[in-house]
Every structure is written in C-alpha cells, then in structure tokens.
Amino acid sequence: MNNIWWQTKGQGNVHLVLLHGWGLNAEVWRCIDEELSSHFTLHLVDLPGFGRSRGFGALSLAEMAEAVLRQAPDKAIWLGWSLGGLVASQIALTHPERVQALVTVASSPCFSARDEWPGIKPDVLAGFQQQLSDDFQRTVERFLALQTMGTETARQDARALKKTVLALPMPEVDVLNGGLEILKTVDLRLPLQNVPMPFLRLYGYLDGLVPRKVVPMLDKLWPHSESYIFAKAAHAPFISHPVEFRHVLVALKQRV
C-alpha cells in the first residue's frame, strides 16, 4: 500500500489537519505551523501523488479523501486550501463523525464556471491540462503566479509558493492532470448544504481563482456556515496574512 507523508507536531487538545492545494505540498504551511502547533496538535499532509506521498497515480476526489483518511486522527478540524478544500469537504460528507469542524480556505465547491456561477472558465483549466504535457514546470509556475496577483506582497508570496514547489520533486504529470480534472468537474454545492459540523469558509478579497462573488451566494445556499474575507489577500491568505489567519483559527477552536 502506498503511504501518505504525514507529520504531526504540537501538543494541543484539538487536532488540526492541513491539506494543501494543487501542485504543492505540506511545506506551504511552514509560514504558520510553529504558531499553530502551540494551539493545536497539527497534522501536515502531502496529498497522494504530491510532495513526499509518492507512488500514486491520478485519483478521483473520493479516492484521494479515502487515502488521506487512512492515516488521520479519529477526530479533527479539517482545513483544506484550494483543491485541499474539496478533499476536506469530501471527508466531511462521507465521514462526518471524523470531522470536528470543516474549514475551507480560498476554495470553492465548484471551481469551474457554470451557468450563473462564477469560477474559472473550463477552457482555462483545459488549457492548463494541455500545457502540462508540453512544459509542466512552467505551467505550474503560471498557476502559482495567478494565486498571488493583486496583493501588496504578490512577488514575495509567489516566491514563497515557488520555493515550496521546488523544495521537493515535482508531482507526476498524470497526478497534476488528475488534480485539474477534479477542479474542472467536481460540484459539491448541493451536498454541502447538509453537513452537520461547524463550517468556516475563508476567502481572499483579491483572489483571482475563487471570485468573491461566490461568498454571498454560498452564505445563502449554506446558512449554517460562516464566511470570513481577508480584505487584502488573494488565493493564499495564510502566506500574506499569517497573524490574522492564526487568530481566525484559534477563535474557531474556542467555539468547537
């Protein structure tokens, strides 16, 4: 059986699992892991096929969620960023008893634009898939640059993301392609209406991948959930606004 790379740190009485986004790995959390581990028992995970979790091919969202869950604590707050938000959401849907609270960061239940639903144009995602087979390192770098555009610290945030990618071997092309396929096809808008646990959605006001127009739409669709917008952040608020990000999570811990 292929193993998921998993690191646990901290002594908190609440477990917090952090799931990264497409093309990246758990090193992306190093800007906040020390501070968070003083409040939580923190679990850093490389999603299957990414970072140090080698030996996986392209997986469906359900397969990815099951692979991660095998090594997870019995109960935890699950936090997923971007693609990781879909994985955390899938776990909340299929194993709600394992999820103390669900937190999605710069994530959408449906990343792809649909009728009357803002998102990434499907042909843009298809274009990324096509470019992966031509020059996949450059394609990943382009995707990362999109994530920080517009912030006051865009250049240094983009450098931090690129450093995270280059710190470890690149994922296989079919793994990257499978992740884009999830972003292109998955739609959890209706299933997530019924999750029973506390549900916090975090957004960057300047995010170019998850338009802020989805926030009031999901507030209405999921009235049991809460939303919070980082006013000057783009797609990676934990990198651009680590202190504010930590405060939001510590406040959540006190409520659950």
Swiss-Prot record:
Its EC number is 3.1.1.85. The active site is at S82, D207, H235. GO terms for molecular function: pimelyl-[acyl-carrier protein] methyl ester esterase activity. One of its GO terms (biological process) is biotin biosynthetic process. The keyword Repeat does not apply. HAMAP family: Carboxylester. This is Pimeloyl-[acyl-carrier protein] methyl ester esterase. It comes from Escherichia coli O157:H7. The lineage of its organism: Bacteria, Pseudomonadati, Pseudomonadota, Gammaproteobacteria, Enterobacterales.
